[in-house]
Amino acid sequence: MAYEVTMNKQGQVLGRKGQETRRRLMTATRRLLCTSSPVDLTAVAIAKAAGTSSASFYMYFDDVQDVLYALSLLAAEDMSEVISFFDRAWDHEVIEAEALRLVEAFNSVWSKHREVLRYRNLEADRGDSRFEELRMNTYVPFIEKFAQRIMSINPVGGGRRKGDAYAEATVLHAAMERLAATDPVVMERGLGSKRMN
């Protein structure tokens, strides 16, 4: 995906210092998300946590939702690496181990970006077209490649139809995402991928 911003909101080319300030604002937002709801974040709080002014915040982002969208783009880049798991050959003799590696990689991305991905889904569910498009740009390739993997394991001659494989991939993706979105403390009590062993 290679998400990169080269200009600020005023159309000026971002140099090293500008890129660093933008990165600090994004890092501060991510830190604040660990203790605050995304709907409670303010540009002032983010700028203060980043050690800059709110005027600087608006040089790089339109509003808090804009910085959360930028963080969602980074999460999408990480999720594209998980999707690439489907591009390599899976050993059918140890298919459960292959599936577990996929689930663990998926959970790892969610652990890194949980608050941002929850917000992405919230805004998509509320009808924000930017967040909906971003979510679908992640979901569709994942589900398509997952369905293709299901078909390769149990081809049409084996009784599974293409539509069934897509339905199974959709349900499995939804289940994986729901578990990954769950509070980490709950996951550490033995729910999720550790139960698959």
Q: Which residues does each PLM region occupy?
A:
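Helix-turn-helix
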Residues: R24, A28, L32-D66, A70
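N-terminal intrinsically disordered/low-complexity leader segments
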Residues: M1-E20, N154, G158-R161, E188-L191
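Alpha-helical DNA-contacting segments of helix-turn-helix folds
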Residues: L33, D40, V67-A75, R120, ...
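Short, hydrophobic secondary-structure boundary micro-motifs
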Residues: T42, L117-N121, E132-E133, G158-G159, ...
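Amphipathic alpha-helical packing segments from all-alpha helical-bundle domains
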Residues: E77, E81-I83, S108-K112, Y119-L122, ...
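Hydrophobic alpha-helical connector segments
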Residues: A70, S84-K112, A165-L172
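Amphipathic alpha-helical linker/stalk segments
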Residues: V13, L71-E98, L117, S152
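Generic hydrophobic, amphipathic alpha-helix propensity
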Residues: G18-T29, I46, L71-M79, F146
